Amino acid sequence: MSSVFGKPRAGSGPHSVPLEVNLAILGRRGAGKSALTVKFLTKRFISEYDPNLEDTYSSEETVDHQPVHLRVMDTADLDTPRNCERYLNWAHAFLVVYSVDSRASFEGSSSYLELLALHAKETQRGYPALLLGNKLDMAQYRQVTKAEGAALAGRFGCLFFEVSACLDFEHVQHVFHEAVREVRRELDKSPLARPLFISEEKTLSHQTPLTARHGLASCTFNTLSTASLKEMPTVAQAKLVTVKSSRAQSKRKAPTLTLLKGFKIF
């Protein structure tokens, strides 16, 4: 599929070496980004969470019989894109999420896709993007039709899916794995430089805001807030690893799955 986002940034290597993929989850507050992340990583559904926390998780996956080291950044932009460079300079691919029962979240997803398109144009690098309509279990309250979602995805040349983080692990897993496949497809065409890895100990130098140069005022680049990278525990291990971003201090709890990134998991 032709995309306005171009090609990903990643190193090449033997197929025996796990492909490293950084995936950023973008969207407005309440779209279900955290629920999708935890569903994919633990097969569990969360009912409560702190929307102000931003974490990056690491998981070893097998996609099409090939090993993948997948890092997932669960962003916390609230209602508008903010401090965008923390994920624009980090991710190989983006999952843009909206809730099918929220017109506002759908409109917000359009802003993220525009931001990604501008960034790809300026850097002349590629970022596979997938548009995801979440909360399909709330379809009786739907404010955004499937046709509208497909049309928006078509406008930016990205893949489109509708899922429910509440009900459906297999389809959620398929979306994350499809993001990996998109990165592979682009790397097969033209492998480029490795991505920028970030930690809380280091921040990026300030640059002229991308959106200021293009009139997209919603994204601001204040003091960069970057998330720590943590290995995601398996459900069987039931070991909690909770890391808050620079908005809060890091925490480690006793072995349990009661809380994960401020979530209650059922």
UniProtKB/Swiss-Prot annotation:
Its EC number is 3.6.5.2. GTP binds at residues 27-34, 74-78, 134-137. It comes from the Eukaryota. GO terms for molecular function: G protein activity; GTP binding. It catalyses: GTP + H2O = GDP + phosphate + H(+). The keyword Amino-acid biosynthesis does not apply. Belongs to the small GTPase superfamily. Ras family. This is Ras-like protein family member 12.
